[in-house]
């Protein structure tokens, strides 16, 4: 049996290697550019007719990465964030020591020190400033906006930074460090962008790390008496080379969401031009978002935990005749070669093409032979509708500093398709923080969380308010309901059995594949 499984795995990996042209550097966009402090290069752009969004649906996740280097050259500040279009801000990036597993911030000035308008220069105490203070202020004013610290990314995944996951002692250090980061800086959880666990030991260690983090976060919630859990997410690849080793069932049990990096399917590593974020198709690269989504679900991921990544940038090819053709060069890009911010697209003189079969778009300047693969609002709309149709959690964006504003914004576009967004409350109570102003809520009373959901939102009840169901040991516990929220340790009756939630859950059926519930036996 063991030999057979090994041979099957070897055969699968051989097929992947022969059939796919995507290589391990396919998400290098999720890194800090070398010239991040320089102003982005400016390019003339073409006008595109804004798309009008009519469809509305149930509550969804809108998660977007905010980079701590974006405050420099891109001049994108925390005050530029539009909270009403987001449910999660993923703050990128922190680093991890491969020697110890300890987490560290990567830019003390941006993260902790920069003074923004309204910040005092002479207040007493040990106070937090920088972007992280601004994130906490956003949370106080928008009680349904969650902020997670992202650890890793392409840059901080290199040189064996995540090799620590194979060592139980270093994993334990990481977990302790993660809890400290949450408590000190007022985060709602942790996101891990490990690019990539491409071996059995790394994948197994990564799954073990996530399991330990989930346990620690649930314990933290219980210790503090919080009503909602601390969230754990992972940025995961869409290319089979990079997801083949993942321990999906174990990861799914630990994760709040999978942030699917559904982009960078094409770039300078290919010998031909292609779409970088096609929903379907992918005949030349053997990669598509739909294929990746189906793989994750088939291998144990819950559909309602998957956030589809949408790029807020384009990948360029020079001196080419079109999609699938050869090219020479990738152009200067906005902040790094070959990558143009969505704000700069389409480039002047280019015509925009949309393929509604594969659900892709690109601009092409035939006079220059310049092609840029990126998502238009229309394509983002179709992707959001796919999220709805397939019961996915929502959308994820890389990164906020490169989005447009108003009706051209892809974040605004998908929020408009979804209508109502996730209303899960954030955390503001951090009495153990090392920072005085985090401990005292910045000296002000926080805004109350939203008490009414937008039109079209499903009604959600807490487990405490749900009707009881059953007799015997089930007599005093609520009956399970798909619209009720249960936190770790709470019980429910379902189909004549008593069940105990392992962690926060909404809509996960007792006994289902998500593995959220423990069966305590018949009532």
Task: Place the predicted regions along the sequence by residue.
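Fungal secretory targeting signals
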Residues: 1-48
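Glycan-recognition patch characteristic of GH18 chitinases/ENGases
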Residues: 28-182, 412, 422-423, 427
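Glycan-binding loop/region signatures in secreted carbohydrate-active enzymes
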Residues: 32-58, 99-121, 135, 151, ...
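Substrate-binding surface in catalytic domains of secreted glycosidases
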Residues: 63-64, 100-124, 196-345
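Active-site-proximal beta-strand/loop segments in catalytic clefts of secreted hydrolases
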Residues: 64-70, 91-96, 150-154, 193-197, ...
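Short, acidic/polar
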Residues: 68-84, 166-184, 240-251, 289-293, ...
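Conserved, mostly hydrophobic/aromatic
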Residues: 89, 149, 192, 213, ...
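Tryptophan-rich substrate-binding surfaces of secreted polymer-degrading and adhesive proteins
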Residues: 456-457, 463-523
């Amino acid at each position: 049996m063991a030999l057979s499984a090994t041979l099957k795995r070897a055969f699968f990996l051989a097929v992947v290697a022969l059939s796919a042209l995507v290589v391990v550097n396919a998400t290098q966009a999720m890194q800090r550019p070398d010239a991040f402090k320089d102003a982005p290069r400016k390019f003339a752009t073409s006008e595109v007719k804004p798309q009008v969004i009519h469809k509305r649906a149930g509550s969804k996740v809108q998660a977007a990465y905010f980079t701590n280097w974006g405050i420099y050259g891109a001049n994108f500040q925390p005050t530029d964030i539009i909270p009403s279009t987001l449910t999660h801000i993923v703050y990128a990036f922190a680093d991890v020591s491969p020697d110890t597993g300890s987490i560290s911030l990567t830019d003390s000035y941006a993260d902790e020190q920069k003074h923004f308008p309204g910040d005092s220069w002479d207040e007493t105490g040990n106070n937090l400033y920088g972007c992280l203070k601004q994130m906490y202020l956003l949370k106080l004013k928008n009680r349904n906006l969650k902020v997670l610290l992202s650890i890793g990314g392409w840059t901080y995944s290199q040189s064996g930074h995540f090799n620590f996951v194979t060592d139980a002692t270093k994993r334990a250090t990481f977990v302790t460090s993660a809890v400290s980061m949450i408590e000190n800086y007022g985060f709602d959880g942790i996101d891990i962008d490990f690019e990539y666990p491409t071996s059995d030991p790394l994948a197994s260690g990564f799954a073990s790390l996530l399991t330990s983090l989930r346990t620690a976060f649930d314990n933290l919630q219980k210790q503090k008496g919080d009503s909602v859990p601390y969230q754990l997410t992972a940025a995961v690849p869409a290319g089979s080379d990079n997801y083949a080793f993942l321990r999906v069932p174990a990861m799914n049990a630990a994760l709040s969401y999978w942030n699917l990096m559904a982009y960078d399917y094409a770039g300078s590593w290919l010998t031909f031009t292609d779409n970088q974020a096609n929903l379907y198709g992918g005949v030349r690269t053997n990669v598509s978002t739909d294929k990746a989504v189906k793989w994750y679900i088939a291998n144990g991921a819950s559909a309602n935990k998957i956030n589809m990544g949408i790029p807020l940038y384009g990948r360029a090819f020079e001196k080419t005749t079109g999609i699938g053709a050869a090219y020479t060069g990738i152009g200067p890009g906005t902040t790094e070669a070959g990558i143009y911010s969505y704000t700069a697209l389409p480039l002047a003189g280019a015509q925009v093409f949309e393929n509604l079969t594969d659900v892709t778009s690109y601009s092409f300047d035939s006079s220059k032979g310049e092609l840029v693969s990126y998502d238009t609002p229309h394509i983002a709309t179709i992707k959001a509708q796919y999220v709805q149709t397939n019961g996915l959690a929502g959308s994820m964006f890389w990164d906020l500093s490169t989005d447009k504003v108003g009706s051209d914004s892809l974040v605004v576009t998908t929020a408009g398709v979804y209508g109502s967004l996730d209303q899960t409350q954030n955390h503001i109570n951090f009495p153990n923080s090392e920072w005085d102003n985090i401990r005292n809520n910045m000296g002000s009373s926080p805004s109350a969380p939203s008490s009414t959901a937008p039109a079209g939102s499903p009604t959600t009840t807490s487990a405490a308010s749900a009707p009881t169901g059953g007799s015997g040991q089930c007599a005093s516990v609520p009956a399970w309901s798909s619209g009720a929220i249960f936190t770790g340790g709470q019980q429910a009756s379902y189909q004549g059995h008593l069940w105990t939630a392992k962690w926060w859950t909404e809509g996960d059926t007792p006994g289902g594949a998500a593995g959220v519930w423990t069966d305590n036996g018949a009532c």
